Swiss-Prot record:
Appears to regulate cell growth through interactions with the extracellular matrix and cytokines. Binds calcium and copper, several types of collagen, albumin, thrombospondin, PDGF and cell membranes. There are two calcium binding sites; an acidic domain that binds 5 to 8 Ca(2+) with a low affinity and an EF-hand loop that binds a Ca(2+) ion with a high affinity. Disulfide bonds join C67-C78, C72-C88, C90-C125, C96-C118, C107-C144, C150-C260, C268-C284. This is SPARC. The gene is SPARC. Its main location: secreted. It comes from Coturnix japonica (Japanese quail). Residues 256-291 form the EF-hand domain. Residues 1-17 form the signal peptide. Residues 84-146 form the Kazal-like domain. Ca(2+) binds at D269, D271, D273, Y275, E280. Keywords: Basement membrane, Calcium, Copper, Disulfide bond, Extracellular matrix, Glycoprotein, Metal-binding, Secreted, Signal. It is found in: Secreted, Extracellular space, Extracellular matrix, Basement membrane.
Length: 298
């Protein structure tokens, strides 16, 4: 996989911004994307009028904003009802920040290009409870374009590149960590063994034949990276399963560059329940059943 793909996805894999879209029966608790500032960064300031003949000092009164700690999912914003209680309501797409470039556009599964993820989720919110809204998901980052079909031969090559990429992402994070807290101490200990292994295949645009041989030869190096990525995605909620929402931070940047992404993740869902369990995930990447260990998801 090319280096520029690697560095783009390295950031996406770690940031794990909030999940893109929640499936039915899923509770998604994330910050509103309409602003980069934390919700309720500044409490509402209540102005005090001036009196012509004040008899005592008038102190400024700071009222608590009910929305300060009330988080809404993508597409919704917090408002206060008549009882001064916070509630989440659909955001008006026209209130989304103006976009400045093509890279902010996103493509929905309806094959429609939206100006930004904010516009997409605000639109989707208005469709809640409808068949169209249930089927609508954020497909990938960037304007909609033709995605060629994934051939069977290409599908078998995809996990080879993905495994190598996951390993290299961890190594890069380890090398850049120092005081950045990119990895936990437990994760560092695992990656250190990979980093110090002289037999490790260096990052590069390798042939699928070389990647296949390296996986067979250095199989143990790939066990932890596969578990690690699962743990990075399994966040909302942390339940041992990956939903469409949780996969989005990984798949959305990948699809325009790796056209087998969608088919690969669909194939991983062996029981077609719309969720990918750890066992299904690890199996997709060629990890043997005896080496699948939930304790490695750290």
């Amino acid at each position: 996989m090319r280096a520029w793909i690697f560095f783009l996805l390295c950031l996406a894999g770690k940031a794990l911004a909030a999940p893109q879209e929640a499936l039915p029966d899923e509770t998604e608790v994330i910050e509103d994307v309409t602003t980069e500032e934390p919700v309720g960064a500044n409490p509402v300031q209540v102005e005090v009028g001036e009196f012509e003949e004040p008899t005592e000092d008038v102190e400024e009164i700071v009222a608590e904003n009910p929305c300060q700690n009330h988080h809404c999912k993508h597409g919704k914003v917090c408002e206060v009802d008549d009882n001064n209680s916070p509630m989440c309501v659909c955001q008006d797409p026209s209130s989304c920040p103006a976009t400045s470039g093509v890279f902010e556009k996103v493509c929905g599964t309806d094959n429609k290009t939206y100006d930004s993820s904010c516009h997409f989720f605000a639109t989707k919110c208005t469709l809640e409870g409808t068949k169209k809204g249930h089927k609508l998901h954020l497909d990938y980052i960037g304007p909609c374009k033709f995605i060629p079909p994934c051939l069977d031969t290409e599908l078998t090559e995809f996990p080879l590149r993905m495994r190598d990429w996951l390993k290299n992402v961890l190594i890069t994070l380890y090398e850049r960590d120092e005081d950045n807290n990119l990895l936990t101490e437990k994760q560092k200990l695992k990656v250190k063994k990979i980093h110090e292994n002289e037999k490790r295949l260096e990052a590069g645009d390798h042939t699928v034949e070389l990647l296949a041989r390296d996986f067979e030869k250095n199989y143990n190096m790939y066990i932890f990276p596969v578990h690690w990525q699962f743990g990075q995605l399994d966040q909302h909620p942390i339940d041992g399963y990956l939903s469409h929402t949780e996969l989005a931070p990984l798949r959305a940047p990948l699809i325009p560059m790796e056209h087998c992404t969608t088919r690969f993740f669909e194939a991983c869902d062996l029981d077609n329940d719309k969720y990918i369990a750890l066992e299904e995930w690890a199996s997709c990447f060629g990890i043997k059943e005896k080496d699948i260990d939930k304790d490695l998801v750290i």
